[in-house]
Protein backbone atom coordinates (compact mmCIF):
# COMPACT_ATOMS: atom_id res chain seq x y z
CA UNK A 1 0.00 0.00 0.00
CA UNK A 2 1.36 3.40 -1.00
CA UNK A 3 0.66 6.30 1.34
CA UNK A 4 0.42 8.88 -1.42
CA UNK A 5 -0.65 11.69 0.95
CA UNK A 6 2.99 11.79 2.01
CA UNK A 7 4.19 14.14 -0.72
CA UNK A 8 5.83 17.56 -1.15
CA UNK A 9 2.56 19.23 -2.12
CA UNK A 10 1.05 18.46 1.29
CA UNK A 11 4.38 18.31 3.20
CA UNK A 12 2.61 16.85 6.23
CA UNK A 13 4.76 16.61 9.35
CA UNK A 14 4.20 14.35 12.34
CA UNK A 15 5.24 14.20 15.98
CA UNK A 16 4.37 11.69 18.71
CA UNK A 17 3.72 12.49 22.35
CA UNK A 18 2.24 10.81 25.40
CA UNK A 19 -1.49 11.38 25.67
CA UNK A 20 -1.06 12.78 29.19
CA UNK A 21 0.89 15.67 27.65
CA UNK A 22 -1.93 16.77 25.36
CA UNK A 23 -3.86 19.04 27.78
CA UNK A 24 -0.68 21.05 28.42
CA UNK A 25 0.10 21.19 24.69
CA UNK A 26 -3.42 22.43 23.92
CA UNK A 27 -2.81 25.40 26.22
CA UNK A 28 0.89 26.07 25.64
CA UNK A 29 1.74 24.67 22.22
CA UNK A 30 4.83 22.59 21.50
CA UNK A 31 8.21 23.66 22.87
CA UNK A 32 11.79 22.74 21.96
CA UNK A 33 13.74 20.36 24.17
CA UNK A 34 15.77 23.15 25.75
CA UNK A 35 12.73 25.26 26.64
CA UNK A 36 12.08 26.21 30.25
CA UNK A 37 8.35 26.01 29.49
CA UNK A 38 7.48 22.45 30.41
CA UNK A 39 4.68 20.84 32.35
CA UNK A 40 5.81 19.51 35.74
CA UNK A 41 3.88 16.35 34.81
CA UNK A 42 5.44 16.01 31.34
CA UNK A 43 5.89 12.41 30.20
CA UNK A 44 8.96 11.94 27.99
CA UNK A 45 8.88 9.10 25.46
CA UNK A 46 11.51 7.89 23.02
CA UNK A 47 15.26 7.41 23.10
CA UNK A 48 16.42 9.61 25.97
CA UNK A 49 20.10 9.14 25.08
CA UNK A 50 19.52 10.45 21.55
CA UNK A 51 17.39 13.30 22.88
CA UNK A 52 20.30 14.33 25.11
CA UNK A 53 22.87 14.02 22.29
CA UNK A 54 20.86 16.37 20.09
CA UNK A 55 21.77 19.17 22.50
CA UNK A 56 25.29 19.08 21.02
CA UNK A 57 24.53 18.93 17.28
CA UNK A 58 24.64 22.33 15.57
CA UNK A 59 22.15 23.43 12.91
CA UNK A 60 24.12 24.92 9.98
CA UNK A 61 21.39 27.21 8.58
CA UNK A 62 19.54 30.19 10.10
CA UNK A 63 18.08 30.44 12.66
CA UNK A 64 20.96 28.18 13.79
CA UNK A 65 21.53 26.94 17.30
CA UNK A 66 21.44 23.29 18.32
CA UNK A 67 18.96 20.56 17.41
CA UNK A 68 17.31 20.77 20.81
CA UNK A 69 16.48 24.43 20.08
CA UNK A 70 13.84 23.01 17.71
CA UNK A 71 10.59 21.05 17.90
CA UNK A 72 11.28 18.02 15.66
CA UNK A 73 8.81 16.33 13.33
CA UNK A 74 9.08 13.51 10.81
CA UNK A 75 7.52 13.57 7.35
CA UNK A 76 5.73 10.28 8.10
CA UNK A 77 3.55 9.10 10.99
CA UNK A 78 5.09 5.62 10.67
CA UNK A 79 8.41 6.38 12.29
CA UNK A 80 11.04 3.93 13.52
CA UNK A 81 10.81 5.68 16.90
CA UNK A 82 7.09 4.87 17.13
CA UNK A 83 7.99 1.24 16.37
CA UNK A 84 10.76 1.24 18.98
CA UNK A 85 8.45 2.72 21.62
CA UNK A 86 5.89 0.02 20.90
CA UNK A 87 8.40 -2.87 20.90
CA UNK A 88 11.04 -1.65 23.36
CA UNK A 89 13.68 -2.15 20.68
CA UNK A 90 17.07 -0.63 21.43
CA UNK A 91 16.30 -0.30 25.11
CA UNK A 92 13.62 2.33 24.54
CA UNK A 93 10.97 2.35 27.28
CA UNK A 94 7.80 0.73 25.99
CA UNK A 95 4.57 2.71 25.86
CA UNK A 96 1.17 1.26 25.00
CA UNK A 97 -0.36 2.39 21.71
CA UNK A 98 -3.36 3.78 23.59
CA UNK A 99 -1.03 6.22 25.38
CA UNK A 100 0.56 7.61 22.19
CA UNK A 101 -0.89 10.54 20.28
CA UNK A 102 0.34 11.44 16.79
CA UNK A 103 0.22 15.19 16.13
CA UNK A 104 0.05 16.43 12.54
CA UNK A 105 0.91 19.73 10.92
CA UNK A 106 2.30 20.76 7.54
CA UNK A 107 5.49 22.52 6.61
CA UNK A 108 3.34 24.78 4.45
CA UNK A 109 1.31 25.70 7.55
CA UNK A 110 4.55 26.49 9.38
CA UNK A 111 5.58 28.79 6.52
CA UNK A 112 2.13 30.40 6.42
CA UNK A 113 2.40 31.29 10.12
CA UNK A 114 5.88 32.73 9.66
CA UNK A 115 7.49 30.29 12.08
CA UNK A 116 11.28 29.88 11.77
CA UNK A 117 12.22 26.38 10.63
CA UNK A 118 14.64 24.16 8.77
CA UNK A 119 14.23 20.66 7.36
CA UNK A 120 16.56 17.84 6.42
CA UNK A 121 16.73 15.10 3.81
CA UNK A 122 17.51 12.45 6.46
CA UNK A 123 17.78 12.04 10.23
CA UNK A 124 18.99 15.42 11.46
CA UNK A 125 21.54 13.96 13.88
CA UNK A 126 23.55 12.29 11.11
CA UNK A 127 26.67 14.09 9.89
CA UNK A 128 25.55 13.59 6.27
CA UNK A 129 22.20 15.38 6.69
CA UNK A 130 21.55 18.20 4.24
CA UNK A 131 19.64 21.16 5.66
CA UNK A 132 17.17 23.44 3.88
CA UNK A 133 14.99 26.41 4.82
CA UNK A 134 12.99 26.89 1.63
CA UNK A 135 10.02 24.68 0.59
CA UNK A 136 11.36 24.72 -2.96
CA UNK A 137 13.79 22.04 -1.76
CA UNK A 138 11.14 19.61 -0.49
CA UNK A 139 11.93 17.28 -3.39
CA UNK A 140 15.23 16.51 -1.64
CA UNK A 141 13.18 14.24 0.63
CA UNK A 142 12.78 10.61 -0.50
CA UNK A 143 8.98 10.70 -0.77
CA UNK A 144 8.65 7.35 -2.61
CA UNK A 145 10.46 5.70 0.30
CA UNK A 146 8.16 7.34 2.85
CA UNK A 147 5.11 6.26 0.87
CA UNK A 148 6.19 2.62 1.14
CA UNK A 149 6.15 2.66 4.98
CA UNK A 150 9.28 0.55 4.83
CA UNK A 151 12.27 1.30 7.04
CA UNK A 152 13.85 -2.15 7.10
CA UNK A 153 17.60 -1.99 6.69
CA UNK A 154 18.86 -2.84 3.21
CA UNK A 155 22.53 -3.78 2.65
CA UNK A 156 22.21 -2.46 -0.90
CA UNK A 157 20.99 0.93 0.38
CA UNK A 158 22.78 1.60 3.67
CA UNK A 159 21.40 5.15 4.04
CA UNK A 160 17.77 4.10 3.56
CA UNK A 161 16.75 4.22 7.24
CA UNK A 162 18.40 7.62 7.70
CA UNK A 163 16.58 9.05 4.63
CA UNK A 164 13.31 7.64 5.92
CA UNK A 165 13.75 9.78 9.03
CA UNK A 166 13.98 13.17 7.31
CA UNK A 167 12.98 15.88 9.78
CA UNK A 168 11.16 19.20 9.91
CA UNK A 169 12.50 21.35 12.74
CA UNK A 170 10.48 24.30 14.07
CA UNK A 171 12.58 26.74 16.05
CA UNK A 172 11.69 27.43 19.66
CA UNK A 173 7.96 27.03 19.97
CA UNK A 174 5.05 25.94 17.80
CA UNK A 175 1.61 27.36 18.68
CA UNK A 176 -1.41 25.12 18.80
CA UNK A 177 -2.92 26.84 15.75
CA UNK A 178 -0.10 25.35 13.69
CA UNK A 179 -1.49 21.85 14.25
CA UNK A 180 -3.89 20.39 11.71
CA UNK A 181 -5.06 17.54 13.93
CA UNK A 182 -4.18 14.56 16.08
CA UNK A 183 -4.47 10.79 15.75
CA UNK A 184 -4.99 8.27 18.55
CA UNK A 185 -5.38 4.51 18.85
CA UNK A 186 -8.94 3.90 20.12
CA UNK A 187 -12.36 5.61 20.00
CA UNK A 188 -12.26 5.75 23.80
CA UNK A 189 -9.05 7.77 23.77
CA UNK A 190 -10.46 9.91 20.96
CA UNK A 191 -13.47 10.80 23.11
CA UNK A 192 -11.25 11.58 26.10
CA UNK A 193 -9.03 13.89 24.05
CA UNK A 194 -11.99 15.58 22.37
CA UNK A 195 -13.50 16.30 25.78
CA UNK A 196 -10.19 17.75 26.99
CA UNK A 197 -9.98 20.03 23.95
CA UNK A 198 -13.60 21.15 24.39
CA UNK A 199 -13.06 22.00 28.07
CA UNK A 200 -10.05 24.10 27.09
CA UNK A 201 -11.91 25.81 24.25
CA UNK A 202 -9.48 24.48 21.63
CA UNK A 203 -10.56 23.41 18.15
CA UNK A 204 -8.53 20.38 17.05
CA UNK A 205 -9.55 17.54 14.76
CA UNK A 206 -8.88 14.27 16.60
CA UNK A 207 -9.27 10.90 14.89
CA UNK A 208 -8.92 7.27 15.91
CA UNK A 209 -6.83 5.42 13.29
CA UNK A 210 -5.44 2.21 14.84
CA UNK A 211 -3.93 1.04 11.54
CA UNK A 212 -1.38 3.84 11.81
CA UNK A 213 0.15 2.11 14.82
CA UNK A 214 2.42 -0.94 15.01
Predicted feature locations:
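Active-site-proximal loop/hinge segments that shape catalytic or ion-binding/gating pockets
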Residues: 1-75, 79-214
